[in-house]
Swiss-Prot record:
Keywords: Cytoplasm, Hydrolase, Nuclease, Ribosome biogenesis. GO terms for biological process: rRNA 5'-end processing. One of its GO terms (molecular function) is nuclease activity. This is Putative pre-16S rRNA nuclease. GO terms for cellular component: cytosol. Belongs to the YqgF nuclease family. Its EC number is 3.1.-.-. It comes from Nitrosomonas eutropha (strain DSM 101675 / C91 / Nm57). CDD domains: YqgF (cd16964). The keyword Cytoplasm applies.
Length: 157
């Protein structure tokens, strides 16, 4: 992966003009996955990988990559509200490096602050509350991560 997020983002914006993009909301227990088309700039929740073990996670991701043939992967970067890194930040970065290394697809990190809270509110707006949110929460968070990427200036063609 390039040395800085800005370098990655500018490189991707100049190269990736069309195709499928997968986004991941990384968690220790679950990974939310969203999908979108670069040209349409519209993200959709896809699924939640509910597995803590690394091997089954990457097997499922390999299936998704084979099925959807993405041109870019976006991984949510978890940081504190003030932007400071924490343990999950390093795990997100490691996950992103593994994705790029295993699949050879460019990876961009996108700030994921507040995406879970936004996902929770989104589900509450349609009447899904409490424990009923669990199966969908991470994929909705991934959708918000991907939509933020599409809406940002660095994704503009």
């Amino acid at each position: 992966m390039p040395d800085s997020a800005e370098e990655t983002i500018s490189d991707m914006a100049s190269v990736i003009l069309s195709g499928t993009v997968l986004a991941f909301d990384f968690g220790v227990r679950r990974i939310g996955v969203a999908i979108g088309e670069y040209e349409l700039r519209l993200a959709h929740p896809l699924m939640t990988i509910d597995q803590a073990m690394t091997k089954p996670r990457f097997e499922k991701i390999a299936e998704l990559i084979e099925t959807w043939q993405p041109v870019l992967l976006v991984v949510g970067l978890s940081v504190h509200a003030d932007g400071a890194e924490h343990e999950i930040t390093r795990l997100c970065q490691r996950f992103a490096r593994r994705l790029e290394g295993r699949f050879g697809i460019p990876v961009v990190m996108e700030d994921e602050r507040y995406t879970t809270a936004i996902a929770r509110l989104t589900l509450e707006e349609v009447g899904i509350t409490g424990r009923k949110q669990r199966p969908m929460l991470d994929q909705i968070a991934a959708q918000h991560i991907l939509q933020t990427f599409f809406d940002s200036s660095h994704a503009a063609s």
